[in-house]
UniProtKB/Swiss-Prot annotation:
Pfam families: zf-RING_2. Residues 142-163, 285-311 are annotated as: Disordered. The RING-type zinc finger domain mediates binding to an E2 ubiquitin-conjugating enzyme. Induction: By pantothenate. Its EC number is 2.3.2.27. The gene is HIP1. Probable E3 ubiquitin-protein ligase that functions downstream of HAL3 and is required for HAL3-regulated plant growth. Activation of HIP1 by HAL3 may lead to the degradation of cell cycle suppressors, resulting in enhancement of cell division and plant growth. It catalyses: S-ubiquitinyl-[E2 ubiquitin-conjugating enzyme]-L-cysteine + [acceptor protein]-L-lysine = [E2 ubiquitin-conjugating enzyme]-L-cysteine + N(6)-ubiquitinyl-[acceptor protein]-L-lysine. SUPFAM superfamilies: RING/U-box. This is Probable E3 ubiquitin-protein ligase HIP1. Interacts with HAL3. Belongs to the RING-type zinc finger family. PROSITE patterns: ZF_RING_2 (PS50089). Pathway: Protein modification; protein ubiquitination.
Length: 667
């Protein structure tokens, strides 16, 4: 082997690394083809960078893809003599690799000469490969400022001239429904503590692949090209779906610059790499991460520097619907908490985006064991660690994909896949207890499987539904008692303002009048009407009008009689009025003929001795004369007696009894 030689030149042909072997670090002589990677800006920035001659431990290896295409990868070590090296390679297991590395600066700790011409803020990790069949997601991993990590890239261009750019991804890429691509072989058989880092092609134009555009995006807080991702002050990360069958995870990582120590990635998570171990964390169950596995240093990093805020991106092939919570804040500091809500990425690039509410970041101080409903992707994950804090306390940004913004204090919604009916949800098992919200106890209750935090932290979780009629009787969230009373008062006022006047009923009158004297209003109203009728009747009698008993106690006096003009009071008419009425009515005969009267009328002789002494004989009401013994009397069917001559004439005119007004003779 030759001596140590590390060179970085402005060449478009060959970029080579030659390494000498050492006792604890076997290396290989490899040559990577550097084609069309360094532009004018990158070439200009690399002029002021000098490589330390003692940096001889940069292992460089290659892997073979399915179609035999060359793939290069490299590793980065630490400053200590025995440290864990950052391993970018392919393997089906998590391997920890302990190496005894010689002295000298490493690729993650290189110092800049003079005025630090090379900016290490946002240097993309780009590995181009001709394997177009490898499906994955692109990622722009931008390092923090002050030069903590320098990521270089190498590419290989195939014969067809179409090189799909591969980017280093901190977690493995899982492909469902397709064959798993061959992993990259590791140079050393020892284990790597940080796991395998897969390479994914970039085939979507949502995020540029050049490092210059990556630096521009990382320096700005706002999203320039509308890419579904987030941009923080210290780092920028963007991911977009390439295939529907990608299971994608990203761990939260942060870097706090310190003049004495250089940690490669103090907050990297050690996450299982197999699909069976990843699936229980998303979709069907709720899993939490302990603070010890999250922060190896065990310290509180809230005071130093900006920190990357990653969210795990999850995409399963049409088995788990799109769901998630997007962070609305750009700079969020976390010490031992990891907001791992996956965003609602699309299954394919051509599908329209689904409108899902987006709320601010989550700060939970208590871990609550949530009940799991089979077949429903769980939106609520456990959050551990009491040190979670937000650098923008009091700033609530609730957003919806599609540029709709909510200014409400808490956004409450539910969302389930279309395959899950509303009846399959048991809201009693999904509403958390108040102990899982926050210490202050002012949290709101949200129906569904999502707990909400308090108003002081201005945080909320989202589980969006498919419309307002969805579970109308179960989706009414309970607010604080004061807010609930205010809502009810406003609602009742609005209903009273738009309500039409209704007719009075006895029930309403009774309800309104109760409680004064203990007597229902309906009873008092009846008694009042009786008194009014009696008073009116007395007034009519005082005026000399004809008043009947029935008119007082059976229906009341007709004070306002609409048919008064149509009625005729023949008792108070004069003779002339009766003649005029007779002429107007005409000759109306309702009596019987002479033959019928003679045939049907019962006759007898009057005899005074047949009468009892106590009974006084009344005279004939028709002729008003006394009966004399031997007079002929006629008896009607009702039992009244009259003179035969008088009653004959009466029956010919009218077939009624002059006394009782009943039918005189029934033919």
């Amino acid at each position: 082997m030759q001596g140590q030689k590390n060179s970085v030149e402005q060449l478009a042909d060959v970029f080579g690394f030659d390494h000498a072997s050492s006792s604890g670090n076997p290396v290989m002589d490899q040559q990577g083809y550097w084609n069309n990677i360094l532009g004018s800006v990158e070439s200009h920035n690399l002029q002021g960078y000098q490589v330390n001659r003692s940096d001889g431990t940069i292992p460089y290896g290659n892997g073979v893809h399915q179609n035999g295409t060359f793939l290069g990868f490299w590793e980065s070590g630490e400053a200590s003599a025995s440290g864990s090296s950052l391993h970018f390679g392919g393997s089906n297991e998590i391997k920890a690799e302990q190496r005894n590395i010689g002295g000298g600066l490493r690729i993650g700790e290189r110092r800049l000469v003079a005025e630090r011409n090379l900016s290490l803020d946002n240097v993309d990790i780009g590995l181009n490969i001709n394997g177009n069949d490898l499906s994955g997601e692109n990622s722009n991993v931008n390092g923090a400022s002050q030069g903590s990590e320098l990521h270089g890239g190498c590419s290989h261009t195939g014969s067809n001239g179409q090189a799909s750019e591969l980017r280093l991804h901190p977690y493995r890429t899982f492909i469902l429904g397709a064959d798993q691509p061959e992993p990259f072989n590791s140079l050393n058989g020892s284990e790597n503590p940080l796991g395998d880092f897969s390479l994914m092609p970039e085939g979507i134009d949502q995020r540029p692949g050049s490092s210059l555009d990556g630096r521009r995006l990382a320096c700005k807080r706002k999203n320039i090209e509308g890419v579904n991702g987030q941009c923080s002050a210290g780092a920028s990360t963007s991911f977009s779906h390439r295939n529907d069958s990608i299971f994608h995870n990203i761990a939260s990582s942060s870097h706090n610059p310190s003049p004495s120590t250089n940690l490669p990635s103090p907050n990297c998570l050690l996450v299982p790499s197999t699909l069976d171990e990843q699936l229980p964390r998303y979709g069907a169950t709720t899993a939490g991460l302990s603070s010890s596995s999250y922060d190896p240093s065990g310290g509180n990093n809230n005071s130093g520097g900006s920190q990357r805020s990653f969210r795990p991106r999850t995409s399963l092939a049409q088995h788990i619907g799109p769901y998630g919570v997007w962070p609305s804040s750009s700079t969020i500091r976390h010490s031992n908490s990891w907001n791992h809500q996956p965003p609602p990425f699309q299954s394919s690039f051509d599908e329209p985006p689904e409108v899902i509410p987006v709320v601010s970041s989550l700060n939970f101080q208590y871990q609550h064991p949530m009940n799991v409903v089979p077949g429903i992707p769980q939106m609520s994950h456990r959050f551990t660690g009491p040190g979670a804090s937000s650098s923008r306390t009091g700033n609530l940004e609730n957003r919806i994909i599609g540029s709709e913004e909510f200014s409400a204090r808490n956004v409450v919604a539910t969302s389930f896949p279309d395959a899950v009916p509303p009846a399959a949800l048991d809201m009693r098992h999904l509403i958390p207890e108040p102990s899982s919200w926050n210490v202050d106890g002012r949290a709101t209750t949200i129906p569904g499987n999502v707990p909400s935090s308090s108003r002081a932290n201005t945080n909320s979780m989202v589980n969006p539904p498919a419309g307002s009629p969805f579970i109308a009787h179960q989706n009414l969230h309970r607010r604080n008692p004061r807010n609930l009373s205010e809502e009810i008062s406003r609602l009742s006022g609005a209903l009273r303002g738009h309500q039409h006047p209704r007719l009075r009923s006895g029930f309403l009158l009774e309800r309104q009048g109760d409680g004064v004297w203990g007597v229902p209003l309906s009873t008092r109203s009846r008694e009042g009407r009786r008194l009014i009728e009696i008073r009116n009747a007395l007034e009519m009698i005082h005026r000399g009008e004809n008043v009947r008993f029935e008119s007082i106690f059976y229906g009341g006096v007709d004070i306002h009689d609409r048919h008064r003009d149509m009625r005729l009071d023949i008792d108070n008419m004069s003779y002339e009025e009766l003649l005029a009425l007779e002429e107007r009515i005409g000759n109306v005969s309702t009596g019987l003929s002479e033959e019928e009267v003679t045939k049907l009328l019962k006759q007898r002789k009057f005899s005074s001795w047949r009468l009892e002494a106590s009974v006084e004989e009344e005279p004939c009401c028709i002729c008003q004369e006394e009966y004399v013994d031997g007079d002929d009397l006629g008896t009607l069917d009702c039992g009244h007696d009259f003179h035969v001559g008088c009653v004959r004439q009466w029956l010919v005119v009218k077939n009624t009894c002059p006394i009782c007004k009943n039918t005189a003779l029934k033919s």
